[in-house]
Curated annotation (Swiss-Prot):
The keyword Amino-acid biosynthesis does not apply. It catalyses: NAD(+) + (deoxyribonucleotide)n-3'-hydroxyl + 5'-phospho-(deoxyribonucleotide)m = (deoxyribonucleotide)n+m + AMP + beta-nicotinamide D-nucleotide. It is an enzyme of class 6 (ligase). This is DNA ligase. Its cofactor is Mg(2+); Mn(2+). NAD(+) binds at residues 32-36, 81-82, 113, 136, 178, 296, 320. Keywords: DNA damage, DNA repair, DNA replication, Ligase, Magnesium, Manganese, Metal-binding, NAD, Zinc. The active site is at residue 115. It comes from Blochmanniella pennsylvanica (strain BPEN).
Length: 595
């Protein structure tokens, strides 16, 4: 029993971490298949040992949390997730299961929709006017994004009267839908982002999520966001709604809410399989990204009888598409130095296109991955985009290996600064120990410091930082605040207008929360959540710098490893001097705490 309990705890911990990255950080760490498989494994163990089920388990809840930057909105009707399937026999089992529960012998009708890869939102209308918009959050509490939603043209601020059927507009109407960015608009957005010297978005979903959660609605207004309605969650009007989910969607369209053109009312599970196959064949030609289809029992009366679990409804499923796989030749493997000195092998490929995305390189993460694959330069490999987001080398195609392949030589010295490399974890991880003396670490540290979630200095992208560091204009993060017009005139292709905009952005960044300032320092292991907790507990940066190891270890979200990193960060003379320089009254940074 002890072993089972430990196994369950381990699965929960891993799933929560992945959920945090996906819902809060907008990062897909693993493929949907891997996540769903692990969630199912946990679910099976909890079914066998029901006394070990906890309310906080990923099987019982959704993984997002509302952020402190936004006002919280409580969902009267929870915004649930969907259970996923990947095979036809699972759909047949679903059909059989609901017929048994409903005591139904007839052919079931299903409303089938596209599973658009975007961000779920809830819109509340009263007497036809938009009152508020909220994100999913954890399913019970979301973020108020009304001002940002108001900038999306596809979202009507006022509903139009459906004179043919319902006459007056409903007193209350709560809509559920998806905010997304089309493929073409995403490419254009990234083109503009790169031209501005900023890091491009990794995928359209992340871009949509980040755009929707901007603190400044004027930024959201510049992003090409779209919206489709996929359901009604709450209604109060003179006439009753039709029982058919499909008819309700047609009614939403009559009220001015956009719905997707590929929604179909289908009779029988075999026809649903045909719909799945059809959508799979046209997937690449669609104007937006999808990762499967959604299948809903069409009768809303049946939906009520089938009910919902704590995490997902029992009357709907997401039938996911398998990740696309292609092959490519490995031209080279370069070792890249990150912000903390970790050296990562990057495989450079002959460019290939998977799901409309051109892939030129793949992060191999560590030396063990190179060894596991038995990879050599010149090999042909199979590439998969995990969750249609992260490219990954699945295997080496040994049958295509030639005599011209080369062994990957592991570096003994830092490829950037030449310092000796240290290894740990059975030599699977390589690290340059030169710190800010290493040009790569210095640039990456500065990139992190000025990033949107840190100091948010708009206009200081990677290319600008490269020039500033290469010309010796900045060395530490405090040097950013010593930049002036004369220094910036030295930069190539940087005119007076850009200089003035950057200097304004630097000045604007000086009023910042303590949490974001702590995060900006780049302490190894200190993400946004830990930084926020440290700010609430210690109140000032001076208190945090003076904190002892024991008090740090006792904090929520801070284990012994992160506590040790924080403690030693402030005991490093260079780090301490940089922090003292940053909070020097001459620079004028104003730190405040949000409780």
């Amino acid at each position: 029993m002890k072993f089972v309990k430990q196994k369950i705890q381990k699965l929960r911990k891993k799933l929560r971490h992945w959920e945090y990255l996906y819902y809060t950080k907008n990062e897909s760490a693993v493929s949907d298949e891997k996540y769903d498989a692990m969630l199912e494994k946990l679910n099976q163990l909890e079914q066998i040992y029901p006394h070990l089920i906890a309310e906080s388990s990923p099987t019982q809840r959704i993984g997002g949390v509302s952020q402190y930057n936004f006002k919280k909105i409580h969902h009267k009707v929870p915004m649930l997730s969907l259970n996923s399937i990947v095979a036809s026999f699972q759909l047949l089992s679903f059909d059989k299961r609901i017929k048994i529960k409903l005591h139904a012998n007839h052919v079931m009708s299903y409303c089938c929709e596209l599973k658009i890869d975007g961000v779920a939102v809830s819109l509340l209308y009263k007497e036809g006017k938009l009152i508020y918009a909220a994100t999913r959050g954890d399913g019970k509490i979301g973020e108020d994004v009304t001002e940002n939603i108001s900038t999306i043209r596809a979202v009507p601020m006022c509903l139009k009267i459906d004179s043919n059927k319902y006459g007056k507009l409903p007193y209350l109407l709560e809509i559920r839908g998806e905010v997304f960015i089309s493929k073409l608009c995403f490419l254009e957005l990234n083109k503009i982002t790169i031209q501005q010297g900023n890091k491009p978005f990794s995928n359209a979903r992340n871009a949509a999520s980040g755009s929707l959660r901007q603190l400044d609605p004027s930024v959201t207004a510049t992003r090409p966001l779209s919206f489709y309605c996929y359901g009604i969650s709450n209604y109060c009007g003179e006439k009753e709604l039709p029982d058919s989910h499909w008819e309700r969607l047609q009614l939403c369209e009559n009220w001015g809410l956009p719905i997707n053109n590929y929604i179909r009312l289908i009779s029988g599970v075999n026809k649903v399989l045909e719909y799945y196959s059809y959508i799979k064949t046209i997937r690449s030609n669609l104007e937006f990204n999808i990762d499967g289809i959604v299948i809903k029992v069409n009768s809303c009366a049946y939906q009520s009888k089938l009910g919902c679990g704590s995490r997902a409804p029992h009357w709907a499923l997401a039938y996911k598409f398998p990740s696309e796989v292609s092959s490519a030749k490995v031209d080279n493997v370069i070792f890249q130095v990150g912000r903390t000195g970790i050296i990562t092998p990057i495989a450079y490929l002959e460019p290939i296109v998977i799901s409309d995305v051109t892939i030129r390189k793949v992060n191999m993460h560590n030396i063990n991955e190179v060894k596991r694959l038995g990879l050599m330069i010149g090999d042909t490999v199979r590439i998969q985009r995990s969750g249609d987001v992260i490219p990954k080398i699945v295997e080496v195609i040994l049958s295509e290996r030639t005599d011209h392949v080369k062994t990957i030589e592991l570096p003994r010295f830092c490829p950037v600064c030449g310092s000796r490399i240290k290894t740990w974890r059975n030599q699977s991880i390589l690290r340059c120990t030169a710190g800010l003396s290493c040009l790569a670490q210095r640039k990456a540290t500065l990139e992190h410091f000025v990033s949107k979630k840190a100091m948010n200095i708009y206009g200081m992208g990677n290319k600008i930082i490269d020039q500033l560091v290469n010309q010796g204009l900045i060395f530490t993060s405090s040097d950013v605040f010593r930049l002036n017009k004369n220094k910036l005139l030295c930069l190539e292709g940087f005119g007076l207008e850009n200089i003035e905009r950057l200097l304004r952005s630097i000045e604007d960044s000086k009023k910042i929360t303590l949490a974001r300032f702590i995060y900006a320092l780049g302490i190894y292991g200190v993400g946004e959540t830990v930084a926020s907790n440290l700010a609430i507990v210690y109140k000032t940066i001076e208190n945090l710098a003076a904190a002892d190891l024991q008090s740090l270890s006792n904090l929520k979200y801070v284990g012994p490893i992160i506590a040790n990193n924080i403690y030693h960060f402030f005991r490093n003379p260079d780090n301490l001097k940089n922090v003292q320089d940053l909070i020097d009254p001459a620079i004028g940074i104003q730190l405040y705490v949000i409780t």
